[in-house]
């Protein structure tokens, strides 16, 4: 196995692992963008007025009523929630009782669209840790490979020509007018 192929393969492996680790991170925003594109009414200019959701009425939410399916509980998705956020999903996790409190009426707007989404700082920390781990693995593999190469060099004496271990002595020449000086490498002691 050649060293250039190993480094190339190692860098490709690290890049693919990093990409696979980042795909779940990127799938959340990508899914939100795709949902927003599907919910968009047309290709015309965006509506200049801000999109707001109407306040929820007090009482049990549609998701808490027994006998209703998930599709019915989510409500219509056309003009109401163009950004793909669903305030009902946030209320399901907050209020498991039979009655919605006063704080749960406006609380749906502060909940992220997908509770599985991580904040930006946590994503950045995850990416930083993955890159640090990849660099650590690279240096460990490189150190192990260098030790193996040094062991083989010591065992077989291949390419073991360190300048400290050499003693340079001039060769005897018949021609004295030649300016080229040749040296012989003698290893002193081993």
From Swiss-Prot:
<feature type="region of interest" description="Disordered">
    <location>
        <begin position="42"/>
        <end position="117"/>
    </location>
</feature>
<feature type="region of interest" description="Disordered">
    <location>
        <begin position="168"/>
        <end position="190"/>
    </location>
</feature>
<keyword id="KW-0732">Signal</keyword>
<feature type="signal peptide">
    <location>
        <begin position="1"/>
        <end position="29"/>
    </location>
</feature>
<feature type="compositionally biased region" description="Pro residues">
    <location>
        <begin position="43"/>
        <end position="63"/>
    </location>
</feature>
<feature type="topological domain" description="Extracellular">
    <location>
        <begin position="30"/>
        <end position="123"/>
    </location>
</feature>
<keyword id="KW-0812">Transmembrane</keyword>
<dbReference type="Pfam" id="PF06679">
    <property type="entry name" value="DUF1180"/>
</dbReference>
<feature type="transmembrane region" description="Helical">
    <location>
        <begin position="124"/>
        <end position="144"/>
    </location>
</feature>
<protein>
    <recommendedName>
        <fullName>Membrane protein FAM174A</fullName>
    </recommendedName>
</protein>
<feature type="compositionally biased region" description="Acidic residues">
    <location>
        <begin position="172"/>
        <end position="181"/>
    </location>
</feature>
<dbReference type="InterPro" id="IPR009565">
    <property type="entry name" value="FAM174-like"/>
</dbReference>
<dbReference type="GO" id="GO:0016020">
    <property type="term" value="C:membrane"/>
</dbReference>
<feature type="compositionally biased region" description="Gly residues">
    <location>
        <begin position="100"/>
        <end position="109"/>
    </location>
</feature>
<keyword id="KW-0472">Membrane</keyword>
<feature type="topological domain" description="Cytoplasmic">
    <location>
        <begin position="145"/>
        <end position="190"/>
    </location>
</feature>
<keyword id="KW-1133">Transmembrane helix</keyword>
<keyword id="KW-0325">Glycoprotein</keyword>
<feature type="glycosylation site" description="N-linked (GlcNAc...) asparagine">
    <location>
        <position position="83"/>
    </location>
</feature>
<comment type="similarity">
    <text>Belongs to the FAM174 family.</text>
</comment>
């Amino acid at each position: 196995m050649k060293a250039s192929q190993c480094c190339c393969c190692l860098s490709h492996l690290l890049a693919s692992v990093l990409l696979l680790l980042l795909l779940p991170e990127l799938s959340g925003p990508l899914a939100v963008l795709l949902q927003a594109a599907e919910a968009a009414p047309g290709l015309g200019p965006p509506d200049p007025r801000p999109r707001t959701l109407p306040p929820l009425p007090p009482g049990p939410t549609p998701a808490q009523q027994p006998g209703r399916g998930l599709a019915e509980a989510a409500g219509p998705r056309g003009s109401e929630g163009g950004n793909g956020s669903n305030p009902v999903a946030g209320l399901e996790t907050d209020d498991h009782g039979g009655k919605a409190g006063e704080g749960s009426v406006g609380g749906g707007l502060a909940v992220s669209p997908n509770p599985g989404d991580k904040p930006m700082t946590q994503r950045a920390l995850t990416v930083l840790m993955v890159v640090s781990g990849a660099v650590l693995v690279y240096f460990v593999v490189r150190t192990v490979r260098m030790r193996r190469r040094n062991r083989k060099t010591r065992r077989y004496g291949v390419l073991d020509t360190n300048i400290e271990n050499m003693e340079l002595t001039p060769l005897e020449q018949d021609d004295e007018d030649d300016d080229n000086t040749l040296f012989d490498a003698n290893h002193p002691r081993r």
